[in-house]
Each structure stands twice: as structure tokens, then as C-alpha cells.
């Protein structure tokens, strides 16, 4: 028989991959930050950018194998990203107007990134063996991302400010959502609506001690309603 072959080539590699992932999203910054280096004998390549969405899209690879469950290279990337962005924001006094505590998740809202590393003897973990377990990788990726991203932020203050402002917005929205949930949970579920059917409310409004207590209603033998403690049942 005859063999059929096709050659696939991407001129810009991971940068083009990131643009492809983000093609339908509104850009926060125009640049795709591209990192190509080697740390501790481990080749590291990262392409990343930010969009205006609320989602994080990060894809990680080792020796061109898609590590669906992430692993130590993803942990190193996240650590380097958070540490570097926070340091830049602190040094630039951009977080002074933030009245909320910033978490790692806030730094990754709207982030799109592709991480690709090469490891001589990869150790895979997890049920599907798609999680990298090599501990030495974490520090290498952390260092690579920290150095290159730090340099980019210093050289591009406009883009850096846009990223930090989005981080602050993400943190503020997260805190506001949590407060709204807590307020709803504190309210009595029966407030304003009256009780359905023959249920009788208890006097306590503390949901943590209240319970639904079911007894036999009116029958030939009378009612067992008095058997409840009206304080919390």
C-alpha cells in the first residue's frame, strides 16, 4: 500500500496556541508573554496572556504529553506567577487601594497560558497517569516564570497596571459574593413567606440549632404537637 503523510507546522508555536485559545475572548493586554529558557537543566517554555473573562485556561505539557491533571510544573508556574505579580504590585504601591485580601486565584482570573517542559525521566501520577510528579520541576518553572515575568512587568508598566487592576477587581468581586452568600444564609428561610401547610415556626432564628420536627397531626387520639420544643423545633 501507499503511505500518506501530512506535516503540521506552527510558525509561532505556543504563542500562536494561546492566541487560538483566546480567539473569541476580549483581550486585556495585546501581548502574549513568551518565555523560553532552561533552569536546573530543565527546558521550560511558557506562553501566557490575560483576557477580560472570569475564567482561567491553563494547559500543561511534559515531553509534548498533555498533563490533564497538572502536576509539579503547573504548581511551579502558579507559584512563580503569584509571587512575581504580588511583588510587582506591592513595589508599585498598586495594591494600596485594594481593601481586600488577594489570593492566588485572583491572580489567575482571565489568565490563558500554555506550559511546556522537557524532562529526561518524567514520573507520572494520578489515576490516568497524566499528572507530573517530579519535585525538581517546581523550582525550575517557578524560577523561569518569576524572572521573565518580572522583567516583562518592569518593561511594560501599562500592561502590568491593567493586570493588577483586574486582580483587585477579581478579589473585590469574590469578597462581595461571599458576603452576599453569608447574608442569605443568616436570614431565616421562612422570613416573610409564612409557613407552608401545618408547620409551626420555632422562636429561635439561629439556623445552626434549629431542626424540622415531624409529629402526628390531628387524629382520633388527639395531636402530638405539644411534644416539640418550640424554641428550636
Regions found by a protein language model. Give the residues of each.
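GHKL-family ATPase ATP-binding module
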Residues: 1-233
Amino acid at each position: 500500500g501507499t503511505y500518506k503523510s501530512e506535516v503540521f507546522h506552527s510558525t509561532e508555536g505556543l504563542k500562536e496556541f494561546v492566541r487560538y485559545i483566546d480567539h473569541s475572548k476580549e483581550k486585556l493586554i495585546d501581548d502574549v508573554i513568551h518565555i523560553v529558557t532552561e533552569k536546573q537543566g530543565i527546558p521550560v517554555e511558557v506562553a501566557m496572556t490575560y483576557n477580560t473573562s472570569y475564567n482561567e485556561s491553563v494547559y500543561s505539557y511534559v515531553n509534548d504529553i498533555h498533563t490533564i491533571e497538572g502536576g509539579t510544573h503547573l504548581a511551579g508556574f502558579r507559584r512563580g506567577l503569584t509571587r512575581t505579580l504580588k511583588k510587582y504590585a506591592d513595589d508599585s504601591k498598586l495594591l494600596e487601594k485594594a481593601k481586600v485580601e488577594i489570593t492566588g486565584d485572583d491572580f489567575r482570573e482571565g489568565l490563558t497560558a500554555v506550559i511546556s517542559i522537557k524532562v529526561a525521566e518524567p514520573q507520572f501520577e494520578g489515576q490516568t497517569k497524566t499528572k507530573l510528579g517530579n519535585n525538581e520541576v517546581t523550582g525550575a518553572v517557578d524560577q523561569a516564570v518569576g524572572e521573565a515575568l518580572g522583567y516583562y512587568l518592569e518593561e511594560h508598566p501599562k500592561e502590568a497596571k491593567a493586570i493588577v487592576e483586574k486582580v483587585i477587581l477579581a478579589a473585590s468581586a469574590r469578597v462581595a459574593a461571599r458576603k452576599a452568600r453569608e447574608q442569605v444564609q443568616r436570614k431565616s428561610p421562612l422570613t416573610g413567606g409564612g409557613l407552608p401547610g401545618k408547620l409551626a415556626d420555632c422562636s429561635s432564628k439561629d439556623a445552626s440549632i434549629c431542626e424540622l420536627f415531624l409529629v402526628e397531626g390531628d387524629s382520633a387520639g388527639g395531636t402530638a404537637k405539644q411534644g416539640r420544643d418550640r424554641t428550636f423545633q
